[in-house]
């Protein structure tokens, strides 16, 4: 598995602490290697985080990036609000303040999948 969260370098740095450039270059390199020996070995995944990674713009950019590389399959990981309980146990509940505590709407998940399908990528 290889997680691709955000394509935009500045947004990636804001939310993950690092720009996406190296992450994307590493994926390209690993994808090339996997194509030669094990074409189905490397599965790109994108966690769907409300308002951050699940936007049409971001998902469209990820789907386009993967499509240009010839990727035919990816995985979208639905948002799981149970992480709030972990923060509480760690004494870090303030990190989750204002964040969604609801499961993703199924219609929105279908919409996210359709963005990838439109780029020829099954999810």
Regions inferred by a protein language model and the residue ranges of each:
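C-terminal accessory region of radical SAM enzymes
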Residues: 33, 41, 103-123
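Conserved AdoMet/S-adenosylmethionine-binding subsite of the radical SAM
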Residues: 1-82, 88
